[in-house]
Amino acid sequence: MLDLKAVAADFESFERRLARRGEGAVQALAPVKPLAARRRELNVLLEKQKKEQAEANANIRQLARTDKDAVEGARASLRALGDEVKKTEAALGDVEAELTRLLMVVPNPPSDSVPDGKDEHDNVVVRTWGEQKAYGFTPKPHWELGEALGVLEWQQAAKLSGSRFTILKGAAARLERAIVSFFIDVHTSRGYTEILPPYLVTGETMTGTGQLPKFEEDLFKTTNEPPMYLIPTAEVPVTNMHRDEIFEASAMPVSYCAFSPCFRAEAGSAGRDTRGIMRQHQFHKVELVKLSKAEESEAEHEKMLDDACEVLRRLGLHFRVVLLCAGDMGFSSAKTYDIEVWCPGQGAYREISSVSNCEDFQARRIRVRYRGENGKPRLAHTLNGSGVAVGRTIVAILEQCQEADGTVVIPEPLRPYMGGLERIAAETFPRGVER
């Protein structure tokens, strides 16, 4: 959430910065301006009324010594003035509540280092690791490979849960567990503390990281009141862990990694990635989260990006890093890098991680702070990134590591987690006859 005082003091600057995101961001900010002006008026009026109240109190004390007959009339005037103060305070409270509601749907202004642009076509490739492998055959997409190997099952999953769900069988299920363990081991060796968070959280928790109120249609929630929400990413519970806390500067940065299932309604994604496991209602991910000093968040962002890239480098998967333009960034982010892994069966680079610096945008909502050099509490900066998406790593392994005979070579770092298994070959599983 934006700082109301800062917005009110220089509205045009925020309007100009948000315009880089697109007209929608400017429109979201527009109603704030007249209400901020009304807030200033009410604050001036309240200050004036309280000054008059203090003067009236002093006058009553003086009259009590010099003119007792006039005291009752002065007290009546003071009571009337008190009623006016209460009315002004109530009006101010209403205005501030509405301002908070409005600011909850205004996105984070992009950092100055973010390139201009409207959408994914304006993103900037900043570096590439590895090369596209030359195949002596036409590489297949992962959905064809998974079906031929018998390890990815959609028909039975649809029977259980509908579209955008997948059952992993045999070697694919083992591969998923191996990837998770490998990712966690790499990240903890690089200074992250492992967290296993709750998968159901409150509305306040969802609001803290920016999913609510703007993106409720993308979430799954329970029907009880108040509802609980299934997390769309471990960023939500892990970032909120330190809500209303103050750190000593010496404790920063705080670094966490967390494995969790993620649940997303994928509203607005009809017709996109309907085949395979690229876009699911339920998937697994290892998330990286940091709380940083304000002056160190840019450097910590680059470190987090490198940590996410490291797991892909060790697996030998070809990928590139893309700096998102202002119009393509997520709601809470001030700057985001996407890591895109090469999928030869699809002939495209596909996102496998987003690594974002939210600066103090989330911290203002959850009130997480640290003591600065002067000892005064200062808002922390929050950072998050996929380290990385597990299902999409399976996609990359299936497509990049496929052989002409239809088998898939398992990257060497994962083999110890899979009992030494070196490749995935076709498997046959029991299946009944449909009645």
From Swiss-Prot:
ATP binds at residues 264-266, 351-354. L-serine binds at residues 233-235, 287, 386. Pfam families: Seryl_tRNA_N (PF02403), tRNA-synt_2b (PF00587). GO terms for cellular component: cytoplasm. The keyword Nucleotide-binding applies. Pathway: Aminoacyl-tRNA biosynthesis; selenocysteinyl-tRNA(Sec) biosynthesis; L-seryl-tRNA(Sec) from L-serine and tRNA(Sec): step 1/1. Signal peptide: none annotated. GO terms for molecular function: ATP binding; serine-tRNA ligase activity. The keyword Amino-acid biosynthesis does not apply. It is an enzyme of class 6 (ligase). It is found in: Cytoplasm. It comes from the Bacteria. InterPro entries: aa-tRNA-synt_IIb, aa-tRNA-synth_II, aa-tRNA-synth_II/BPL/LPL, Ser-tRNA-ligase_type_1, Ser-tRNA-synth_1_N, SerRS_1_N_sf, SerRS_core, tRNA-bd_arm. Keywords: Aminoacyl-tRNA synthetase, ATP-binding, Cytoplasm, Ligase, Nucleotide-binding, Protein biosynthesis. It catalyses: tRNA(Ser) + L-serine + ATP = L-seryl-tRNA(Ser) + AMP + diphosphate + H(+); tRNA(Sec) + L-serine + ATP = L-seryl-tRNA(Sec) + AMP + diphosphate + H(+). GO terms for biological process: selenocysteine biosynthetic process; seryl-tRNA aminoacylation. Its EC number is 6.1.1.11. Belongs to the class-II aminoacyl-tRNA synthetase family. Type-1 seryl-tRNA synthetase subfamily. Consists of two distinct domains, a catalytic core and a N-terminal extension that is involved in tRNA binding. Catalyzes the attachment of serine to tRNA(Ser). Is also able to aminoacylate tRNA(Sec) with serine, to form the misacylated tRNA L-seryl-tRNA(Sec), which will be further converted into selenocysteinyl-tRNA(Sec). PANTHER family: SERINE--TRNA LIGASE (PTHR43697:SF1), SERYL-TRNA SYNTHETASE (PTHR43697). HAMAP family: Ser_tRNA_synth_type1. Homodimer. The tRNA molecule binds across the dimer. This is Serine--tRNA ligase. It comes from Anaeromyxobacter sp. (strain K). The gene is serS.
